[in-house]
From Swiss-Prot:
Disruption phenotype: RNAi-mediated knockdown causes a defect in pachytene progression resulting in a proximal gonad devoid of nuclei. The phenotype is more severe in gck-1 (km15) mutant. RNAi-mediated knockdown in adults decreases lifespan. Residues 338-348, 453-462 have a biased composition (Basic and acidic residues). The gene is lin-45. Residues 481-748 form the Protein kinase domain. Protein kinase that participates in the induction of vulva and has roles in fertility and viability. Acts downstream of the Ras protein let-60. Required for progression of developing oocytes through the pachytene stage. Plays a role in responses to M.nematophilum-mediated bacterial infection by promoting tail swelling and preventing constipation. Positively regulates lifespan upstream of mek-2 and mpk-1. This is Raf homolog serine/threonine-protein kinase. InterPro entries: C1-like_sf (IPR046349), Kinase-like_dom_sf (IPR011009), PE/DAG-bd (IPR002219), Prot_kinase_dom (IPR000719), Protein_kinase_ATP_BS (IPR017441), RBD_dom (IPR003116), Ser-Thr/Tyr_kinase_cat_dom (IPR001245), Ser/Thr_kinase_AS (IPR008271).
Amino acid sequence: MSRINFKKSSASTTPTSPHCPSPRLISLPRCASSSIDRKDQASPMASPSTPLYPKHSDSLHSLSGHHSAGGAGTSDKEPPKFKYKMIMVHLPFDQHSRVEVRPGETARDAISKLLKKRNITPQLCHVNASSDPKQESIELSLTMEEIASRLPGNELWVHSEYLNTVSSIKHAIVRRTFIPPKSCDVCNNPIWMMGFRCEFCQFKFHQRCSSFAPLYCDLLQSVPKNEDLVKELFGIASQVEGPDRSVAEIVLANLAPTSGQSPAATPDSSHPDLTSIKRTGGVKRHPMAVSPQNETSQLSPSGPYPRDRSSSAPNINAINDEATVQHNQRILDALEAQRLEEESRDKTGSLLSTQARHRPHFQSGHILSGARMNRLHPLVDCTPLGSNSPSSTCSSPPGGLIGQPTLGQSPNVSGSTTSSLVAAHLHTLPLTPPQSAPPQKISPGFFRNRSRSPGERLDAQRPRPPQKPHHEDWEILPNEFIIQYKVGSGSFGTVYRGEFFGTVAIKKLNVVDPTPSQMAAFKNEVAVLKKTRHLNVLLFMGWVREPEIAIITQWCEGSSLYRHIHVQEPRVEFEMGAIIDILKQVSLGMNYLHSKNIIHRDLKTNNIFLMDDMSTVKIGDFGLATVKTKWTVNGGQQQQQPTGSILWMAPEVIRMQDDNPYTPQSDVYSFGICMYEILSSHLPYSNINNRDQILFMVGRGYLRPDRSKIRHDTPKSMLKLYDNCIMFDRNERPVFGEVLERLRDIILPKLTRSQSAPNVLHLDSQYSVMDAVMRSQMLSWSYIPPATAKTPQSAAAAAAANKKAYYNVYGLI
């Protein structure tokens, strides 16, 4: 690659474009109010070729073929023809993109769009024509056409020494056990036991908060542990020009993990906020004095310093600077007034006067009540003068003061006193204690807040919210629903129409004084029922414990299949296509229930509902084996008795010879009886009135429904399916998945065969004129040999043959 020559530019004082706001860097989550977002000042960390911040003419360079002393005459030349229509741009963090060379678009606008899409701050970057960041930068005020015409290749590099040092796009997340619990940096709630943490940036979060974790890894959190990173940051800070250079070096010196004090980290800097805290003569030491009066004053929460943790460590919380205390007190009072004002808006919907409210006097170490702060949503720390822990030392100015306007000051004054980088990170970095203090863990906040004393933990005057009465999951309280009227009763309970956020069906179960084991089994079944969601299954909405055990399900606006077949007048004669569709939907719903290990145990036409549109089928009253099981005591042992509707009961259920006769095949048998009802419009065994006789004969396999009552247009494949569903041996019955496939394979004829006899004309009657004409045509079509056509016997035989052929064609014989 040939060396590129650069030239100075005189048009570099162009103001920042208002259409290119500076985006917030993801890896710096606490810089919402930093000075980086200011458009009227250039960041001291910005390169001379920063995409959004052009500098003076002596710091911008332009690409040119030769270094010329004067720039006169350049406007008279024609715009150069560019060689490349697309330019490859290499971005930080090993990213790359392509930029289209558009006429009139400057390089600053084009490259800034790429950086903003990736949430990279353009002020912290500079652009080179080489992969070496030490090479001279290009002038971004030039158009992309001019740059493309002078580039030896179609590549540009965007470098940022600062981002490469303090940020990374790769977290080192590991699973951690937090004992004691730590606060999540996303939701600020405690992490109980198991959680996740990045080993680089120390970002902690719950598993449920993983989607809100920052994309970039902020390596500044590891500054107190990494000496190499501190050296690199000192090198970057040395490149900062102007009054902000000393501020950056002071902050970095206080964060450095070295035992000695850095020469740059002196409190005698020119910054007014830094000089307000003096190390010499600014700290009062309060030794511990054990006395009743001292103990009373220490345990009182109203005192300025309630309690010291150790008698060997000095109390460094008292700062002998009254002006600074008053200054911070004004800030805290203003913040408290703002908080009370916002609370008044939330409660009344209008702005209430807060001047008459009592503003509490903040003591050292008291945090603004109600303020929650984490690394994603930072707030101003209200600790006025540093850490309140007796084992830590405040080596840096308080957060929220540098780079922010104080009361009575203009924003311009505060904006010129700090660098954008320092203001963005100052209140997010932990402090490092000196050698005299015991070691402590790094806190994610700027200050390590002192834990409260026992007398401070509870506030007797604070109103506590009333506790909500406890009830189990999906349990509905008696005052939350209304019973309207009775709908009907069945084998296991009575159904009512009711109101529970809409019309519902409330079924009171026939259960009296359930035992603890039965109640536990009932809750387990409810836990399964609440997970059922299917188009052909009634929606389970909850259960009721008192005054009677009941379940609440979806209300079906329609009638049961039993009423459509046997009760309503005139009776509904379903077409064969509608019958197949109903049976398909029942098979779909039952196949879904069996996939959830739910046995219906009482499938019948009374529990199959047709909606008002007559096209949707719903299955109800499923599951609840505990309620549908009846136990009797015989010889000191419990024996299970069959319960349910005997007409739909499978033979093995009637016999009760197995420990658990209820299987998916027993539901298939009940489905076969439902098929018989809808195909014959009759109940099975209607000619037998003795209930015990039906139980005995069906249980032994001597009795089956009368197949002769089934309608004659039933396809043979459906008849075969019906026979398989009501087989005596349950192992020979299909499952509902197979039943569904066989129903889908049934093909109905497009034309329906007529069941009435045709009007056949007798041969000895007089034919009509039309019959005579057609008979003559048939005679003319027949082939008669010439030798035999002359004889009358042959002619009569031919006519008789034609008549037979005529009637065979029209189906009359």
